[in-house]
Every structure is written in structure tokens, then in C-alpha cells.
């Protein structure tokens, strides 16, 4: 027969075990919810930005994930109205993701996106270049290192700008397997204090590959009107497919080997402008389209294509409500404890190559964080070219000496 003491111990252990399991379940639910919210935010941010980029009327390729990652590395250091604007512009407010939950959400995303030995290859890398001897808060560095897996590397933007440029481009080339060989073509400003970088690389083989022998020159109708001969790939197989009567478009999924990643094609009817579909899309509608896909025997014909793009991101982010981050009113005191930093520019490059074997894509994003001025908004006076001078008596107001220097 169990003693009272033994029963008490068993009861305590049961309570502790139950509480521990409840806590684990709570944290798992919270983690799942945070990841779902991050997915919604990144996708919605990408769709909002895509609409604006498409106004240029050109082919586009960019990485919502890469841009969102680099900008979020800055966002976690934002405070006040700067943080409010960035949270809204990056889609976090709409997705219900608080600023303090963003680092953990990205941490979980990086875990899920890790490549294994089978299927497609996806690599993501972050790095933060910091001006030598510039004081960055340990709390900010911890978030970058532990949650964003970011290296933190001291560099000298002031005296070694050319070397920094070459080092950045070499890093970009290495991560993207030479698909993108440069991000910056000249040294960054000597006032740069942080350069937050993200690079992503993807390579996947189609689960069902196209036969090169079936690739032929066929007409592709630009803007549904002007015809041009391009290489078109064809195959017949079962693929996830649907037709959406509201958007009046066909939706096709081509999976990559390993079934972890796939390419989704959205093809409007001939009499429907692509812009109509683009304007109607949202993170929720994309999710719904994917949920409606059903395995269907179908004849697929798509073009081989390569795209490269370096969109001017900054102006579109401002249109999307992120104004203060780029102004002298910016508050990034979560980075260094002071309000003397602002985002000077956001750089982005992306490419994709689609052929019979599969697809290869890469993107790189950079957020340039600068001092608002060299000396806390004081004007600078550098007499390094011809000037005049005079010596004046302040009491009498008379000029005692007057001259000019033209050569030294």
C-alpha cells in the first residue's frame, strides 16, 4: 500500500508534468501562430510591392522573403512612429504580428527552410557590416546573431570603402553561386554605420522534367498582341491544376523534386488583362487558389525564360507608408540607443532561369543605415578649394585686411 508521502510525491510529479506539457503545447501553438502570421505578412508585402513594381510595365523578378528579411533586421531596431510605419508597411500589423515576435518568427522560418540532402537546394544567409568601433547595443546584436543567424562583421566604411564594396560583392557572388556577382557598384557613403544584408539561392529540378526534344520555337504574344518566337517546353502529365471563375484564370503547380517547393503559374484568359489578376490577388486569395488545386491530366506548354531585375525599392516602400525610416525623423534607437541613424537606401537584385531541367533563382537585399550627419546635424565647412578671407574689427566694423587664396 502506498504511503501518504509517496502519494503526495506522485501528485506533485503529475501536476508538474501536466503543467510542463501544457506549457509546451502553449509555446508550440504560439510558434505555429507566429509562423503563420509571418507567412501571411511576407506574402502580402510581396503582393503589395509587386503591384507597384508592375506599374512600370516591365518584366519583374524580386524576392519578398529576401527583402522582408533584410528590412526586418532594421525593423527590430526601430522605435516609436518609425516602428509603427514599418510594421504596417511590412505587413506585420495586418497579419497580427507584434514587433517583439518578429525575430522568433524568422528564426522558425529559417529552421523550416533549411535544405536537406534530398530534393531542391535553398540557401539563405544574413550578415551585418558595422563600422569599426561604432557602438551597437548588445541586445540588438544578440537578436541579429541568435534569431536571424546573422554574422556581425566590423568594417571601415570611412577609410576602406572600396575594399568593403569588393568584399560585399564577393559575399553576394559566393552565396548566390555566381548568379548575382555584385550588389553595389561604388563604395557606400563614409557616413554608413550598418549595412544589413540578406542573400537567398534556390535550385530545383522539376519532379517531372520536360523533354528537350519537345522544345520548339513557338509564338509568345507580348501584351496579348505582339507575337515573338521563343523556345516553348511541353509535356503531358498529372499536375495540380484549377480554373478560377472569379479571376478568370488558370492556375498550375509544377512541383520540384522532393515536393518541398513548387512553381505556381497564374494564366489569365485571353480577354483578361494580367493587371486585373494582379490587382485582385492577396495573400488570402493566393492561399485559396492553392487550396483549390486538384491533380489533373493536362498538356503543359510554358516558355524557357531568364529574368534579371534591380528594382528601385526605396520609393515604393515610401508609397507603402514607410516614410519616416528614410528621413531625419527616423528612430532606430533600438540599434545604438540614440536617434542619429536613418535608412539611406534599400538595394535589391534578383534573377531566375527556367528551363527543361528545373529552375535556378537568386536574390540579394541590402539596407544601408547611415548617420543623419557627420556631427549631429551640424553643417560642415571644408575649405579645400579657393576662398576669400577678411579680418574685421568687430567694434568698429571696419575691414582691416582682405584677401583671397587661389593656390596653395
From Swiss-Prot:
The keyword Secreted applies. The record marks 372-373 as: Reactive bond. One of its GO terms (biological process) is negative regulation of serine-type endopeptidase activity. Keywords: Disulfide bond, Glycoprotein, Protease inhibitor, Secreted, Serine protease inhibitor, Signal. CDD domains: serpinJ_IRS-2-like (cd19577). It is found in: Secreted. Residues 1-22 form the signal peptide. Its main location: secreted. One of its GO terms (cellular component) is secretory granule. PROSITE patterns: SERPIN. GO terms for molecular function: serine-type endopeptidase inhibitor activity. Specifically expressed in hemocytes (at protein level). Pfam families: Serpin (PF00079). Glycans are attached at residue 174. Disulfide bonds join 50-249. Belongs to the serpin family. Serine protease inhibitor that inhibits proclotting enzyme and to a lesser extent clotting factor C and clotting factor G. Monomer. Forms a covalent heterodimer with clotting factor C chain B. Forms a covalent heterodimer with proclotting enzyme heavy chain. PANTHER family: GH10112P-RELATED, SERINE PROTEASE INHIBITOR, SERPIN. This is Intracellular coagulation inhibitor 2. The lineage of its organism: Eukaryota, Metazoa, Ecdysozoa, Arthropoda, Chelicerata.
Amino acid at each position: 500500500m502506498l504511503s501518504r508521502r509517496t502519494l503526495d510525491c506522485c501528485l506533485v510529479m503529475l501536476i508538474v508534468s501536466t503543467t510542463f506539457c501544457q506549457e509546451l503545447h502553449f509555446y508550440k501553438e504560439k510558434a505555429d501562430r507566429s509562423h503563420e502570421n509571418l507567412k501571411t505578412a511576407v506574402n502580402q508585402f510581396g503582393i503589395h510591392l509587386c503591384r507597384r513594381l508592375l506599374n512600370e510595365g516591365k518584366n519583374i523578378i524580386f524576392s519578398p522573403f529576401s527583402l522582408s528579411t533584410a528590412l526586418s533586421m532594421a525593423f527590430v531596431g526601430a522605435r516609436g512612429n518609425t516602428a509603427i510605419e514599418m510594421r504596417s508597411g511590412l505587413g506585420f500589423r495586418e497579419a497580427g504580428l507584434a514587433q517583439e515576435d518578429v525575430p522568433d518568427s524568422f528564426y522558425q522560418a529559417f529552421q523550416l527552410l533549411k535544405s536537406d540532402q534530398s530534393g531542391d537546394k535553398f540557401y539563405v544567409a544574413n550578415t551585418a557590416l558595422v563600422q569599426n568601433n561604432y557602438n551597437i547595443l548588445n541586445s540588438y546584436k544578440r537578436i541579429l546573431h541568435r534569431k536571424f543567424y546573422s554574422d556581425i562583421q566590423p568594417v571601415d566604411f570611412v577609410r576602406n570603402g572600396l575594399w568593403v564594396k569588393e568584399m560585399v560583392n564577393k559575399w553576394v557572388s559566393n552565396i548566390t553561386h555566381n548568379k548575382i556577382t555584385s550588389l553595389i557598384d561604388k563604395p557606400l557613403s563614409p557616413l554608413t554605420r550598418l549595412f544589413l544584408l540578406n542573400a537567398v539561392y534556390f535550385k530545383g529540378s522539376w519532379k517531372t522534367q520536360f523533354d528537350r526534344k519537345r522544345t520548339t520555337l513557338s509564338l509568345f504574344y507580348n501584351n496579348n498582341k505582339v507575337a515573338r518566337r521563343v523556345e516553348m517546353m511541353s509535356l503531358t502529365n498529372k499536375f495540380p491544376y484549377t480554373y478560377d471563375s472569379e479571376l478568370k484564370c488558370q492556375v498550375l503547380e509544377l512541383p520540384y523534386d522532393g515536393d518541398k517547393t513548387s512553381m505556381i503559374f497564374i494564366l489569365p484568359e485571353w480577354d483578361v488583362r494580367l493587371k486585373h489578376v494582379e490587382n485582385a490577388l492577396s495573400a488570402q486569395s493566393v492561399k485559396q487558389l492553392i487550396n483549390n488545386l486538384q491533380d489533373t491530366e493536362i498538356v503543359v506548354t510554358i516558355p524557357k525564360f531568364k529574368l534579371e531585375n534591380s528594382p528601385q525599392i526605396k520609393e515604393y516602400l515610401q508609397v507603402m507608408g514607410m516614410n519616416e525610416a528614410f528621413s531625419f525623423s527616423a528612430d532606430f534607437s533600438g540599434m545604438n540607443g540614440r536617434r542619429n541613424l536613418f535608412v539611406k537606401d534599400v538595394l535589391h537584385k534578383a534573377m531566375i532561369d527556367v528551363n527543361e531541367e528545373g529552375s535556378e533563382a537568386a536574390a540579394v537585399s541590402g539596407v544601408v543605415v547611415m548617420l543623419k550627419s557627420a556631427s549631429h546635424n551640424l553643417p560642415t565647412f571644408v575649405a579645400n578649394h579657393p576662398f576669400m578671407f577678411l579680418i574685421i574689427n568687430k567694434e568698429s566694423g571696419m575691414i582691416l585686411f582682405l584677401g583671397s587664396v587661389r593656390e596653395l
